[in-house]
Amino acid sequence: MSRLTLFAPLLFGLLSAVTGALGMTVRLPKNDWFGIRMHVVMSSDAAWLAGHRAGGPWLFAGGIVALAAGVGLLVFCPDASMGARIATSSLVGAFLLAGVAAWRAQTAARRFL
């Protein structure tokens, strides 16, 4: 199994979980690197905070799904084909949760336009 297959879920999960946790606790400052990067969310500081407060839990959940998949790949899955299926399905789930986070953030941030 390739290193990318092993570490992509871990890296994506860690970044998503940390970003989600900081966002929902209102400790993620507006920046150019991390967070939900949508025009409406970035339109003001109030929109940024409201968007991340609303989307943070979903982003955190997606990160936990990806982290669990990464740990599962490292511990339980030496078979390459099974590992690829686990990584793909878990990352699809994590990306869907990130999509819900973006939708929730956009909805919350629109109140500040």
Residue positions per predicted region:
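A broad detector of short, well-ordered amphipathic alpha-helices
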Residues: 18, 49, 53, 100-103, ...
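Select subsegments of transmembrane alpha-helices in polytopic membrane proteins
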Residues: 53-66
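Membrane-water interface of transmembrane alpha-helices
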Residues: 20-35, 104-105
